Design a protein with these regions (language model features):
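Acidic, polar-rich N-terminal leader regions of halophilic archaeal proteins
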Residues: 1-94
Length: 94
């Protein structure tokens, strides 16, 4: 039996992209009542927060001030979305 796949569309003002995801994976990750877009949004926010955190805190040399500002904004958005800091959510704090 073939795996059921869902297609989601990610849009900005001028561009869009389609993403195909496994329904079984979404079901595994979803908390009660969460929609597929909410699950994918949560995963995207975790991924983006992890990438900017690594770029600012775990890269060689001093981070660019613009990159630090992007991290600060991302972490604020993360906390708004999840009701906890990135450090609290991951157990990784500095």
């Amino acid at each position: 039996m073939a795996e059921e796949i869902q297609t989601l569309t990610i849009e900005s003002e001028d561009e869009s992209d389609e993403l195909e995801v496994s329904t079984a994976l979404i079901d595994l990750l979803a908390e009660e009542g969460e929609t597929t877009p909410e699950v994918v949004g949560d995963v995207a926010m975790f991924g983006l927060a992890g990438r900017i955190h690594a770029a600012v805190h775990h890269a060689q040399g001093e981070p660019d001030p613009e990159l630090e500002a992007a991290e600060e904004a991302t972490m604020e958005l993360f906390e708004e979305r999840f009701g906890m800091t990135y450090g609290e959510a991951t157990g990784h704090q500095h």
